[in-house]
Amino acid sequence: MHFDLDRLTPAERVEIDRLFRELEDARSKESARRGFLPFIKRMWPDFIEGYHHQRIADLFDDVLNGKRKRIIINMPPRHTKSEFASIYLPAYFLGKFPNKKIIQASHTSELAVGFGRKVRDLVGRSDFRDVFPGVDLSADSKAAGRWATNKGGEYFAIGVGGALAGKGADLLVIDDPHALALGTPIPTPDGFVAIEDLKVGGFVFG
């Protein structure tokens, strides 16, 4: 269909522009429901995509679509591993499967609960409900480390060594289960050096 824009009134142009924006937004929502990376881009406006992000997103989509049962991701710090795996993935999972259960484990309960707070806040956002209509937090979801959706789904955060007896999960996320404590000796060309004394740009032996 061809439109002669020059023959349209200003009001008609405004209306057409509105309809096009609504169509584009509807496409964006549908894309975000279907794929993890489009969900990231919609929910995280400042996200800058790197070459590795598509690979991680494909792996997560495989897990959610039942093509993989488990994956292990090893990356250097500051490559958005935790943001992807421990914040956006659980939120996306509960958007698609709001009646399922998630367990988030980290080396300390404080870290795990911190992730839980961010996931909870993400699920409670209005733009999340735009992508997944009808999915929201349950009315009593106050605790950051243990909360539920309004569809019966549950989120539980725990530190390594915490009690998990009787707990089950449809999605288990383990982020940094081992952390090097202060004072941990690291081998370097000059001998063993405490981890907190390592210099930026120095060499270590792995």
Spans of features found by a protein language model:
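Contiguous, well-ordered alpha-helical segments that form the cores/surfaces of helical PPI scaffolds
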Residues: 57-61, 83-95
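Walker A/P-loop
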Residues: 68-88
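SF2 helicase motor core recognition
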Residues: 82, 162-169
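Post-Walker A helix-loop "phosphate-sensing" segment adjacent to the P-loop in P-loop NTPases
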Residues: 92-101, 124
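Conserved nucleotide-state-sensing and coupling region of NTP-binding domains
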Residues: 105-161
